[in-house]
């Protein structure tokens, strides 16, 4: 079992119970899933780019990514409905906790010119989204084998009812918010 999951059960739940005066342990917000999304717009011209992006995402997450397709045709972007334009992975359970731990302890501190993550990236319902400009911050990616530096979106979905609860949940994990 991931250390962070044990830490959540032992420490974070008690801390949030006292902070927000919850009546039941089930009211305490928890991390539900983490979604990684990589949009590869250049895949229209070269299908190999999408395969490389999917391989990178598989290495980062430890799970085979789902290829996302265009929902509708857009002439300005030269895409048609059904064209493969990206890939995504939804992590839950044990893999989610392991990824979350690697994200906080290893990957985020390796971001170039890192001064902390914005605390304003909550969606109003306690979910947090962040963008990563380079996939090479993850130790699973071999820098020499990278054909192109790509970014990805990371969304942390929680059961929190408000941004305040979501921020308290992530802060309890020592999430590196900007001061």
From Swiss-Prot:
One Gene Ontology MF term: structural constituent of ribosome
Tree of life domain: Bacteria
A single GO cellular-component term on record: ribosome
Annotated InterPro entries: Ribosomal_uL5, Ribosomal_uL5_bac-type, Ribosomal_uL5_C, Ribosomal_uL5_CS, Ribosomal_uL5_dom_sf, Ribosomal_uL5_N
PROSITE patterns per the UniProt record, alphabetical: RIBOSOMAL_L5 (PS00358)
GO biological process: translation
SUPFAM superfamilies: RL5-like
Keywords per UniProt: Ribonucleoprotein, Ribosomal protein, RNA-binding, rRNA-binding, tRNA-binding
Task performed by this protein: This is one of the proteins that bind and probably mediate the attachment of the 5S RNA into the large ribosomal subunit, where it forms part of the central protuberance. In the 70S ribosome it contacts protein S13 of the 30S subunit (bridge B1b), connecting the 2 subunits; this bridge is implicated in subunit movement. Contacts the P site tRNA; the 5S rRNA and some of its associated proteins might help stabilize positioning of ribosome-bound tRNAs.
PANTHER family attached to this UniProt entry: 60S RIBOSOMAL PROTEIN L11-RELATED
Assembly behavior: Part of the 50S ribosomal subunit; part of the 5S rRNA/L5/L18/L25 subcomplex. Contacts the 5S rRNA and the P site tRNA. Forms a bridge to the 30S subunit in the 70S ribosome.
Entry similarity comment: Belongs to the universal ribosomal protein uL5 family.
Annotated protein name in UniProt: Large ribosomal subunit protein uL5
Species, as recorded: Citrobacter koseri (strain ATCC BAA-895 / CDC 4225-83 / SGSC4696)
Name of the gene encoding the protein in the UniProt record: rplE
């Amino acid at each position: 079992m991931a250390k962070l999951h044990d830490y959540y059960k032992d420490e974070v739940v008690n801390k949030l119970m006292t902070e927000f005066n919850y009546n039941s342990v089930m009211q305490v917000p928890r991390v539900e899933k983490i979604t990684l999304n990589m949009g590869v717009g250049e895949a229209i011209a070269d299908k190999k780019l999408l395969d490389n992006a999917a391989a990178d995402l598989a290495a980062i997450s430890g799970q085979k990514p789902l290829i996302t397709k265009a929902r509708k045709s857009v002439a300005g972007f030269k895409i048609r409905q059904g064209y493969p334009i990206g890939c995504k992975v939804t992590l839950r359970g044990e893999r989610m906790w392991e990824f979350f731990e690697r994200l906080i302890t290893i990957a985020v501190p390796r971001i170039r010119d890192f001064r902390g993550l914005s605390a304003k990236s909550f969606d109003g319902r306690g979910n947090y989204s962040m963008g990563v400009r380079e996939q090479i911050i993850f130790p699973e990616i071999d820098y020499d084998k990278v054909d192109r530096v790509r970014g990805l979106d990371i969304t942390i979905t929680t059961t929190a009812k408000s941004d305040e609860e979501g921020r308290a949940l992530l802060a309890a994990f020592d999430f590196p918010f900007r001061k």
